[in-house]
Amino acid sequence: LTAFLGYLMAVAAIFLDIGNTLRILLKEEPYRTEARQKIVSLIGTSESPEVFCTELERRYKEYRKWAFEHLSEAPEEELWTRGLAPEFPAQRITPLAHELTYQFRQSMGRRVMADGCKEVIHGLHARGYTLGIISNVITTSEIPNWLAEEDLTRYFKSVLLSSSFGRRKPDPSIYLEAARRAEVAPEKCAYVGDNFSRDVTGTRAAGFGMVIILPDTAEKDEAVAPQQQPDLQDQIQQEILKR
């Protein structure tokens, strides 16, 4: 961490993304199949898991388009009763919304912690940095549960998810609220993410002092606008989350 920490001398708080930063997605088909089966069982449909979940994915893409355009995140109950499964009785679906969201995310694949992630968190915390999480996710419970399972909850002073806040990155309000909860001025905050357009644009607008990008493989060859250039990227990848 020596080289990475040298860049952060003026930073008091470090906020981390979840997807492709703290965790990676493994598209393991048996795992996905089991989740699809659980979804149809919870919903109570007679359709096959494959047919039903194919339509579910189509509807989710429509929802994502709306969410991107409006920088908003719907509550899980509304996501299911209005967006993903509106043809089923709301009074039956609403109590199942959180579990349905969890299983829907599992139907995309198994999420595992990035290599070296825990050691990085421990190291940054030991050096006195205030740590936080800012992430766009449709679930309100999966991330807190994961942090508890990995005994990481105590390391994060501020955990802000779009699903609970209602606004998505790159809306600057989600970054500003996370900094407020951490009790650190935005200019003394750094953000570590994987997306040039979302993570750089939002943190810049919020006045964060530094943006660090560990780009996903699919993004590395894409053109990046000048205003989307981070402060640091690949040169610190070995010092932070070795994926």
Write out the residue ranges for each language-model feature.
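N-terminal helical cap/lid subdomain that shapes the substrate entry/recognition surface
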Residues: 10-119, 126-127, 140
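Asp-based, Mg2+/Mn2+-dependent phosphohydrolase catalytic module
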Residues: 1-16, 24-26, 47-50, 118, ...
